[in-house]
Amino acid sequence: MGSPHIAVYSASKHAVIGLTKSAAWECTGTGVPVNCVCPGLIDSRMLSTIMQARNGGNAPMPNEKMVERIPARRLGQASEVASIVAFLASDEASYVSGSAYTVDGGRTAA
């Protein structure tokens, strides 16, 4: 999903998805699954830093208007991203490869 002023960041996220799919094919037969996780707006120091940079150094976390664009109506938590990563690292995900997991409260689906 694109946003103003972050074209390079957005392009790099899409590049990771393409790399994931290619690497999954290249690792065929090795037993090494390749997947990626694509987090959305996560309550984190990174998000706080971005918000401050966009708003002159004194901005709080995302405002209500930003959160309204997320169907879950809240920011994600790092633990929610970690849960997907833990699943992908487990034996239960042994048949999963070449996939991109979006953890964004439905933002890119809306």
Regions found by a protein language model. Name each.
Residues 1, 86, 97-110:
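Short C-terminal tail/terminal secondary-structure segment
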Residues 1-6, 11, 28-29:
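Active-site "substrate specificity/gating" loop of NAD(P)-dependent dehydrogenases
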Residues 12, 20:
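Active-site helix of classical SDR
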Residues 17, 39-53:
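Short, flexible catalytic-loop segment of classical short-chain dehydrogenase/reductase
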Residues 25-29, 94:
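Alpha-helical segment proximal to the catalytic Tyr-Lys
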Residues 33-39, 43, 89, 102-104:
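Conserved SDR Rossmann-fold cofactor-binding beta-strand/turn motif
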Residues 52-70:
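A short C-terminal helix-loop "cap" of Rossmann-like NAD(P)-dependent dehydrogenase/epimerase domains
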Residues 58, 70-81, 92:
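A conserved structural motif in NAD(P)-dependent oxidoreductases
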